[in-house]
Amino acid sequence: MWFKQISFYPLNKEKLPEADVLADKLAEAEFTHCQGLDWFSEGFTAPVSFSPELVFPADFTLRVALKKEEKVLPAGVIRDILEEKVAEIQNNEARNVGRKEKQELKEQITDDLLPRAFTRSSRTEAVFNTRHGYLLVNNAASAKAENILTKLREALGGLEASLPNTKQSPSSLMTGWLLQGHCEGGFELDSDCELKGTGDIVPVVKVSKQDLTADEVVQHVKNGKTVTQLGLVWREQIAFILTQDFTLKRIQYLDVLQEEAESNGDDAAGLAFASQILMAESVSTMLEELVSYLGGWQD
């Protein structure tokens, strides 16, 4: 349940769907397996293993999951069969095979193999935090996060969500914190960061498991590099990497949160319920504190 990486989107809290409405809409876009000549299939699936429901509600949070199944048909397999067929035609009919005919043969081979191809599946989860008005997506890759947002919009007939656009850039804030050797409020420097310079060939410096206040680290900023990723700890509850795109990576929920969830969950459902609430509340509160140090949202 605990998301290890997060992209998030501010939502219009006045226009969020109720759990039953969301479930009904997602049922119309439920996942089905690839059929026949389909290369892939995508749809919503149960977010928890102990329930078939497409929405898992926990207090002010709603959890959903998008599943994608893709056919695996290696290009090398198609190429080998195509070469065999071309050689067979050349030997049996004593003629060359042109580009157009090769393309037609390739398409025929693909159509023959596709129904029997192996599949691989992936899923992206998201939690609506209706109290704070955030959609938290368990993926820091923009393409994956945008995809589940798009699918939710399609299923709901619209969803007012925006990119997290603050008055000050995360990179500027992180660079300032590293330069001054400390953070503001409930944040502390951890032990990892990434810095980038400028120029035709952009120099990149990655620092891992080091004291970020050390002179050799700070000197990179003084030499003109900016921080693009920074390891932070928030109120002794969450350790994470903040990126210049305002995504969170390598999230670790420290013992205090894990223990609180375990004390409130007697079984799988209870633990999932408690973990979902604690994760959504702590992460959203942390994000709001970050937004305040970034000058608030752009108008």
Swiss-Prot record:
**GO BP: any one term:** DNA recombination
Alphabetic keyword roster: Cytoplasm, DNA recombination
Task: List localization entries.
Answer: Cytoplasm, Nucleoid
**One of the record's GO cellular component terms:** cytoplasm
Per UniProt, what is one Pfam family of this protein? RdgC
* Entry keyword Cytoplasm: yes
**Top-level taxon of the source organism:** Bacteria
- What role is this protein assigned? May be involved in recombination.
Please give the family membership noted in the entry. Answer: Belongs to the RdgC family.
Record's protein name: Recombination-associated protein RdgC
Give the species: Neisseria meningitidis serogroup B (strain ATCC BAA-335 / MC58)
- Give the gene that encodes this protein: rdgC
